[in-house]
Swiss-Prot record:
This is Cytosolic arginine sensor for mTORC1 subunit 2. It is found in: Cytoplasm, Cytosol. SUPFAM superfamilies: ACT-like (SSF55021). It comes from Xenopus tropicalis (Western clawed frog). Pfam families: ACT_7 (PF13840), CASTOR1_ACT-like (PF21389), Castor1_N (PF18700). Belongs to the GATS family.
Length: 329
């Protein structure tokens, strides 16, 4: 398998719900007028708490400098795993489950923090730029590591470091954060960029105007429906994660869906905001899912993490993760 280090240098930022109108001009330009920018990597995710933005340095320049934009203090690089041969059958586990053992767990073992963004097309593993030498050393045995430079994929320079590098002891990784599962059903879909103009007004309404601040806080004690919507435009490909109620607002012939029309349930991870320094959160969730062969998408946001699993698996997933949680006591 190949691990590709993409050339985007990324910023991760958060905007409070009540301040989104300060940024809509730049965000609309990034989402719907990308040909007018040099941005190649843009993702916007709305949660009950905030909007999380992942954007490359060129796109970041489209956003106004503001005290209302909270920016994580590192530059991040996006990695993704490419299976050789292109012969992967549709029955193989998709999403974060596929890379749990080969990527997520080894990085957690070396205390390297990751930030995940699953899309309709692929899974991006974000690591801090300063951690890249450690990432490469950790994964070099498992992967052919390639780097994208000026659009060309070339063998990565050997930045691997061995100094201070110890082979980790295998440790159990119990789930340590509270979990909740909202009642919404979600779909992970896409649309042809050429059809984007026909739904731009609808998307703008979904992203910025419907379900305003008044609906945005749902107590985690009674997990009913929550507000969650994710839009990504990365290297020309669009990915959308939305609940079924939102999906029904779109013309049915525009959205791509899997042949099975699969619906997904969410597991939200975190009671208090998780921050960026703790390692192993993605591994705590993805390893039990991989062991049970359950596919999953995983979306990290500025404050909390979100795993999406097939709706028919949700009870088994919750049970498996609660068993893992119990092991910490």
């Amino acid at each position: 398998m190949e691990l590709h280090i993409l050339e985007h240098r990324l910023k991760v930022a958060s905007i409070a719900k009540e301040n989104i109108q300060l940024f809509t001009y730049g965000l609309i330009k990034l989402a719907f007028l990308s040909s007018k920018t040099r941005c190649k990597f843009f993702s916007l995710t709305e949660t009950p708490e905030d909007y999380t933005i992942i954007v490359d340095e060129e796109g970041f320049l489209e956003l106004p400098s503001s005290e209302h934009l909270s920016v994580a203090d590192a530059t991040w690089l996006a990695l993704n795993v490419v299976s050789g041969g292109g012969s992967s059958s549709s029955s193989q586990p998709i999403g974060v489950t596929k890379i749990a053992k080969s990527v997520i767990a080894p990085l957690a073992d070396q205390n390297i923090s990751v930030f995940m963004l699953s899309t309709y097309q692929t899974d991006f593993i974000l690591v801090r730029e300063r951690d890249l030498p450690f990432v490469m050393h950790t994964l070099a045995a498992e992967f052919t590591i390639l780097q994208v430079v000026n659009g060309e994929t070339v063998a990565a320079d050997n930045l691997g470091v061995t100094n201070g590098f110890v082979k980790p002891k295998l440790v159990q990784r119990p789930v340590i954060h509270p979990l909740s599962s909202p009642s919404n059903m979600f779909c992970v879909t896409s649309l042809d960029p050429y059809t984007l103009p026909t739904v731009t007004t609808l998307l703008m309404d979904v992203m910025f105007y419907s379900n305003g601040v008044k609906d945005s806080v749902v107590g985690s004690e009674e997990p009913g429906h929550i507000r969650f919507f994710s839009f990504s435009l990365i290297e020309g490909y669009i990915s959308l994660v939305m609940d079924v109620q939102t999906q029904q607002r779109f013309p049915s012939n525009l959205l791509f869906t899997s042949a099975s029309g699969e619906l997904w349930k969410m597991v939200r991870i975190g009671g208090q905001p998780l921050g960026f320094d703790e390692c192993g959160i993605v591994a705590q969730i993805s390893e039990p899912l991989a062991a049970a062969d359950i596919p999953a998408y995983y979306i990290s946001t500025f404050k909390f993490d979100h795993a999406l699993v097939p709706e028919e698996n949700i009870n088994g997933v919750i049970n498996a993760l609660q068993v893992s949680q119990a092991e910490k006591h």
